[in-house]
Regions:
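C-terminal interaction segment
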Residues: 2-32, 37, 46-49, 67-80, ...
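A structural signal for short, well-ordered beta-strand segments and their strand-loop junctions
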Residues: 58-60, 139-142
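A short acidic/basic microdomain associated with nuclease active sites
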Residues: 55-68
């Protein structure tokens, strides 16, 4: 969320109003470009597909996180482009309300850079996620310039992650690599294999069947 938009929201909401936790909808504005949306949806789709048998995580994008110690919607909120919380119930949410989620903050956050948000993502948000959220893994990615960086929280401070020989960065929290593939950020297994989307999985299966002279449309 842009800082000016956040300030406008705060001015329009009474500081004394305490909202019921279950009524907190996300305040995040639309994503900046179609490519931003494609990248966010790709990360969510791939992780949910890979972890389809798991029910102990929550992955979302462009969703507001409310973290006010006073349990007020009007103060202390932020909406990462993509985040993952581990050790929680996998269910649909209107927003992530820290005081309604046993005090849990995201384990992984990724921000998608743009000309209007890049400096905030690199500086202010990095400090916020380090000092307040205490998020173990923080990444940012620019789908236009392909700038990609990652950090891991060590002794309370973010330390830059070193890329492997393929340029991938390791997420200790996800037990996966993140790396650029065909211009978009994707997951890779510890062995370096691309984590496929459901559509890619189906396409590869269909191709394999055709190699065996089996028409996939007949199955």
């Amino acid at each position: 969320m842009m800082i000016t938009q956040e300030l406008e929201l705060k001015e329009n909401i009474s500081q004394d109003v305490i909202f019921p936790p279950n009524d907190l909808y996300s305040d995040e504005p639309p994503v900046e470009t179609e490519l931003h949306l494609e990248q966010i949806m790709l990360l969510i789709k791939c992780l949910k597909w890979l972890w389809k048998d798991r029910y102990d995580f929550y992955a979302a994008g462009n969703l507001t996180i409310y973290y006010s110690p006073n349990q007020k919607k009007s103060e202390y909120f932020r909406g990462p482009d993509f985040f993952v919380v581990l050790g929680t119930e996998r269910k649909t949410r209107k927003s992530w309300v820290v005081w309604n989620e046993d005090g849990k903050y995201p384990n992984v956050i990724l921000e998608i850079l743009s000309p209007t948000t890049a400096n905030t993502d690199r500086e202010y948000k990095k400090e916020l996620y380090q000092n307040t959220f205490r998020t173990p893994d923080y990444f940012w990615f620019d789908p236009y310039t392909l700038e990609f960086a990652g950090f891991h929280l060590l002794d309370g401070k973010y330390q830059p992650l070193e890329a492997n020989e393929k340029g991938h960065l390791w997420s200790e929290q996800l037990n996966l690599y993140l790396g650029i593939h065909e211009g978009l950020l994707r997951y890779f297994t510890p062995e370096g294999k691309l984590v496929l989307t459901p559509e890619e999985t189906a396409e590869r299966l269909a191709a394999k069947l055709r190699e065996l002279n089996i028409d996939p449309n007949t199955i």
